[in-house]
Amino acid sequence: MPDIIAGSTDGFVEHDQNDIGVNDGWINCRNSATGSDAKNATVFSTAGVYVKKWATDRFQIRRSFFAFDTSAIECPDDGAATATLKIYGRTTGTANIIVVKATKPDLSTGIVQNDFNELTGWNSSFGPSDLTAYSSQVTSWNTSAYNEITLNRSARDDMASL
């Protein structure tokens, strides 16, 4: 399979929620319809995924979004046999992420704050089972090399059909 580089529209959206209640802070932050900041890769050199809990029970979530043109991949009718997403690690050597299907960005329009929950299956009270997982949980992260994430059948089928 050829190497495909993400489009220039990729980037991150984060939501930083201040002064939220102790019992509902995480859910409110995770379920927010919009982010408080967004950066495209052309503007901001790093993207990432993180969740941070401040001492005041304030949560901050950053989600990275990537767009790929997979039209040049020649797949048999039953889809690609294997596919690997490679992301170069920079800082923070811990991981607890899952690659999921998103509806934004596309290859011509960059990421914006309103794209925070542009995740296939998202609704105002979503949980992990509502999303379309493209990988198993990633539990380790290399901060000075490419991290290879094996994409599952759902991702490979979408690569062949989109």
Report the location of each language-model feature.
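Short beta-turn/strand-loop junction motif enriched in small, turn-promoting residues
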Residues: 70-73, 88, 156
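Beta-strand-rich interaction/scaffold domains
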Residues: 90-161
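A near-ubiquitous, low-amplitude feature marking generic local secondary-structure context
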Residues: 47-53, 84-86, 132-142
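Extracellular/lumenal carbohydrate-interaction signature centered on repeated Trp-anchored short motifs
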Residues: 59-60, 70-82, 161
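Hydrophobic beta-strand residues in large extracellular and virion-surface proteins
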Residues: 4, 49, 85-87, 97-102
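Stable alpha-helical elements in mature extracytoplasmic
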Residues: 61-64, 79, 151, 155
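Flexible, small-residue-rich N-terminal segments that precede or flank a structured functional core
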Residues: 1-72, 105-109, 119-123
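A short beta-strand element within beta-rich, extracytoplasmic domains
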Residues: 64-68, 78-91
